[in-house]
Amino acid sequence: MTWASRAGALALACATAAIITWPQALHLTTTVSAHHDAAFSMWRLAWLAHAVVQQPARLFDANIFLPAHRTFAFSVATLLQGTLAVPLIWAGVPLGLIYNLLLIGGIATSALAMTGLVRYLTRSHTAALVAGVAFAALPYRVEHAMHLELQWSAFIPLTWWTLHRLVEQPTYRRGVACGVMVALQVLACVYYGVLLVLVLALTAPAYWWYAGTERLRLTLAPLLCGAAVAVCLTLPYLLPYAAAARIVGSRDTAEVARYSATLTSFLSSPATSLWWGWTADRWGSAELRLFPGLATLLLGALGLWWQQRRVVA
């Protein structure tokens, strides 16, 4: 890619993020979402900046729910975003501005990451740009535009990109890079991190089949090295969650079933959708409106048809 292409991809990603969060881009220092989660996210950022100075060894003993311990792990700690915010908070940058920059930045970097992955897989700059916009503008993402952690999904496509590169040319450096991407996704959003690890485990047989026995032999050691890196980077972060689970308990089977996606979840769009809002409560519910968008589906089908046509020809 040329520098002009990279600049164009960056501009498109930022424009998409600004549209999704509109009108916050016009009032970065004074406007945040009216949803209570925006205030909660700003508190999380501020707590981390406070705790790393005042009580770094007790970071997860936040100033809520006293006398309970590990209360910062009662929700997603957004440790990566908080770490990025620390120097800005210390410099006196308004907290609302920091939150908005991280929110919009999470969407934009997600678009750029998907653009990079698809560009690597297809060698098509146009397809990459379309995929980046589609990933950034998912109806699910728009519905949760107030949730800081749910906008930070860039490390999902980056994990797949590093994994493809590892299978293509197995090296320890690429294995470590893959592990780092997984760890960063966990630190940015535990939800996505857990789902990413599960999907990686489920798709491993397909990669082994694709790679073949000889390539698998070469890939296995770097892959295990990457897995070890991911565990080492995330274990100190996940231990407080295990401790918190002993305090508040874990989700029972009924609750897991209630919030698990079904096939009809992928037909449900947010109620704010102009064309598909009627599907919001018919086939979905909160957290389970996963329709990817008609344009995305049609373009995906067109891409499959076009690829098949090229193969046949």
Positions of the model-derived regions?
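Start-transfer (signal-anchor) and selected internal transmembrane alpha helices
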Residues: M1-W22, A221-A228, W305-A313
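Membrane-lumen/periplasm interface segments of specific transmembrane helices
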Residues: C189, C225-E255, L263, S269-G277, ...
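Membrane-interface coil-to-helix junctions
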Residues: T16-A111, A134-S153, A257-G284
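Transmembrane helices and adjacent periplasmic/lumenal helix-loop junctions
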Residues: Y140, H147, V180-W208, A230-L238
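Specific aromatic-rich, kink-prone transmembrane helix
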Residues: S153-E168
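Transmembrane-helix signature of polytopic, membrane-embedded enzymes
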Residues: M114-A137
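Short hydrophobic alpha-helices at membrane interfaces in multi-pass membrane enzymes
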Residues: E168-A183, R217-L220
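Perimembrane helix-loop-helix junctions
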Residues: R165-V167, L196-V229, Q307-V311
